[in-house]
Amino acid sequence: MQVYMLLPLAVFASLTYQGACEETAAAQTSSDASTSSASSEHAENELSRAKRGSYRMMRLGRGLHMLRLGKRGGPVEPESEENLETLLNLLQGYYSDVPEYPSEFDDTDLAYPYEEYDAPAHPRYRRSTPPTDGVVAPDVLQKGSSEFEDFGDSQLDESDEGYYGYDPENYLYGDFEDYLEPEEGGLGEEKRSLSMLRLGKRGLSMLRLGKREGEEGDEMDKKQDESLNDDFENDDIKRTLSMLRLGKRPMSMLRLGKRPMSMLRLGKRPMSMLRLGKRPMSMLRLGKRPMSMLRLGKRPMSMLRLGKRPMSMLRLGKRPMSMLRLGKRPMSMLRLGKRPMSMLRLGKRDDDEKEKKSLNMSRLGKRSTQ
């Protein structure tokens, strides 16, 4: 009986234990889900806050930009009617007092007839003039007016060097053209000054690089030209030889390998002898001969050196005309092992006849004995 009573108790305990376990698991899952949802909500809130902050900054930037453009400067408040009426009255009075198209601009017309315009009692001509409250001493007014009157009456003198005429009809006409583009001869030298130079255009007597001006320079040029070369003309239009530029110099100053007879130096010849490889007899150097002796391998008797012989004694395969047969040499050229012309047959000597005779005699003796 006891066993039967314990069995349902054990089953009931196991069931309650399983239910408790399932409840704890469900509670854990619900807690996890709640934490995850809370974290996601927190992240979404932070993102929305960042977006809202960015939107606010964008709106602030747009507002500042609109303020720069003159918009949204604040609430637009209409002007009061009193202010508008005063402004209109001032404008109408000013328009009626001042003409629309004034004929002349005069300092005397600057006085305002009405007291309602806020105008100074007198104009300040200089910054150094002390400011006043409307009370001006009479000497100050007289001084200022006299200065302006003196300036208006003053005129430039036409004889002055800085005066070129204010009349537009005389501009670039008449004598003024000679200042800009002087002709040959042109004006006097006192008027052709450096102040008239423009864009590389100068008078004929103007200073250029290396060119002198005045009578002293002309006299020096003439002296140099006469001493150097009498063929050149002394004209004002042409440059003198002593003034030449661009690598050109007079005859006494020639460079680039050309010099006159009186300026010859080492290796330099006069103009009449400046042909390549040609030198006169007095300028011969080693290995150089005059034109009459400039044949290859030919030298005169007076210029023989070691190993060189005159025409009649040339060797190297060349003989005079009377001896131009191969293997023939004259008596005066015999050397060791060489014989005269009458003995120069290949393999033949002076004792050939004796040998022949001896051979013949020996042959005859043999035949006779036989």
Curated annotation (Swiss-Prot):
Residues 210-226, 347-358 have a biased composition (Basic and acidic residues). The modification Leucine amide is found at residues 60, 69, 199, 209, 246, 256, 266, 276, 286, 296, 306, 316, 326, 336, 346, 364. Residues 28-52, 210-230, 344-370 are annotated as: Disordered. InterPro entries: FMRFamide-related_np. Keywords: Amidation, Cleavage on pair of basic residues, Neuropeptide, Repeat, Secreted, Signal. GO terms for biological process: neuropeptide signaling pathway. Residues 1-18 form the signal peptide. GO terms for cellular component: extracellular region. Transmembrane segments: none annotated. Expressed in all ganglia of the CNS, but only in a subset of neurons including L10 in the abdominal ganglion and B16 in the buccal ganglion. Coiled coil: none annotated. It is found in: Secreted. Its main location: secreted. It comes from the Eukaryota. Residues 19-50, 73-190, 213-237, 350-355, 368-370 form a propeptide. Residues 28-40 have a biased composition (Low complexity). Exogenous application of myomodulins potentiates ARC muscle contraction. This is Myomodulin neuropeptides 1.
